[in-house]
Every structure is written in structure tokens, then in C-alpha cells.
């Protein structure tokens, strides 16, 4: 049985979250609880297309260990909620990347890692897509050629912050 709030004092610990003094009861919105769960259990799909993939693998290695942030790399798009586009995307590869993205369940997020994935990099040619945002809705850009593993970790932390600010995104958007 919950203690009545008449004899207990509500203490606001952050905006929209209160605790009942003297108990283990937290009062908050459903958005905050769902976003907390999502942001602390990201499952990225690694889609390495060039040299940035080496740095992405280094970010998952023991030195930085993204697992401590609840990030578990997945090999199947049906199990992932984040896709990390790491490297140069050609026009021939773009439909395949889009198909893999479409196979991911909602809500899904995109991280563009490296100068090539962000802007096309040094390859301003007829065969290179000038940024992953030309065919996917990119949420976080991680610049660099190639970016350090710490930069990818910073990008993932920025994505976690973005997820915590979402409202009402619980399932498939219509």
C-alpha cells in the first residue's frame, strides 16, 4: 500500500520527478520511465563501410567498453534500435543501407560516424552520397576522419540525451 501524501512530503528531485519523503516511491511521467529504459539499453547495428569501422570496433573493445553504458552491438537489424553508418556510402550501397534501416523496429535512431558518412568526405564524386542524411534521418553526427573511439562514445551519449527529451514516442509513428 502506498503511503498517503497527506502525511508525507513530496520532494521534487528534478523537473517532473518527485519522491515521497521517507519512502521508496518515485512519482514521474510514463515518458520519463520509457525514455530512461530506452536510453540506457541502446542496441546499435554496426554498419562499417570504410576505415571508420575500425574505430567503431575499438569503441566496443575493453579499453572504452561501451557495454558499461548499456550498449550492446547487434548483428541483426531486427534486434537493433540504432544504426551506426561508419564510412563512405556510395549510390550503389545507399538502397541496401536504407533496406537495412527499414528492417529495424521503431523507434530507431541513426548515427553518422566519420566525415564521409556526415558530408561525403573528400570523395566529391558522381558515385558517392554526400552524407547519410540524403537518404536517412540522421540523429547524431560524429565528425572526423576517422573519428576517435572517444568521439563515437560522445556521440552515443548525445543520442542518449536526445532520447531522454522525447515525448510520446512509444511505438510506430503514424
UniProtKB/Swiss-Prot annotation:
GO terms for molecular function: 4 iron, 4 sulfur cluster binding; iron ion binding; NADH dehydrogenase (ubiquinone) activity; NADH:ubiquinone reductase (non-electrogenic) activity; quinone binding. The keyword Signal does not apply. One of its GO terms (cellular component) is plasma membrane. Pfam families: Oxidored_q6. It is found in: Cell inner membrane. It is a peripheral membrane protein. NDH-1 shuttles electrons from NADH, via FMN and iron-sulfur (Fe-S) centers, to quinones in the respiratory chain. The immediate electron acceptor for the enzyme in this species is believed to be ubiquinone. Couples the redox reaction to proton translocation (for every two electrons transferred, four hydrogen ions are translocated across the cytoplasmic membrane), and thus conserves the redox energy in a proton gradient. Belongs to the complex I 20 kDa subunit family. This is NADH-quinone oxidoreductase subunit B 2. It comes from Thermodesulfovibrio yellowstonii (strain ATCC 51303 / DSM 11347 / YP87). The gene is nuoB2.
Amino acid at each position: 500500500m502506498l503511503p498517503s501524501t497527506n502525511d508525507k512530503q513530496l520532494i521534487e528531485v528534478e523537473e517532473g520527478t518527485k519522491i515521497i519523503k521517507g519512502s521508496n516511491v518515485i512519482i514521474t511521467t510514463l515518458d520519463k520511465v520509457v525514455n530512461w529504459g530506452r536510453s540506457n539499453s541502446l542496441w546499435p547495428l554496426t554498419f562499417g563501410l570504410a576505415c571508420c569501422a575500425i574505430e567503431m570496433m575499438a569503441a566496443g573493445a575493453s579499453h572504452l567498453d561501451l557495454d558499461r553504458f548499456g550498449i550492446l552491438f547487434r548483428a541483426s537489424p531486427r534486434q537493433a534500435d540504432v544504426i551506426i553508418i561508419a564510412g563512405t556510402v556510395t549510390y550503389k550501397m545507399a538502397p541496401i543501407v536504407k533496406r537495412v534501416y527499414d528492417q529495424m523496429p521503431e523507434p530507431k535512431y541513426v548515427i553518422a560516424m566519420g566525415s564521409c558518412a556526415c558530408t561525403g568526405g573528400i570523395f566529391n564524386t558522381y558515385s558517392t552520397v554526400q552524407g547519410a542524411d540524403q537518404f536517412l534521418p540522421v540523429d547524431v553526427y560524429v565528425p572526423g576522419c576517422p573519428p576517435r573511439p572517444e568521439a563515437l562514445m560522445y556521440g552515443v551519449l548525445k543520442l542518449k540525451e536526445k532520447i531522454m527529451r522525447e515525448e510520446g514516442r512509444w511505438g510506430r509513428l503514424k
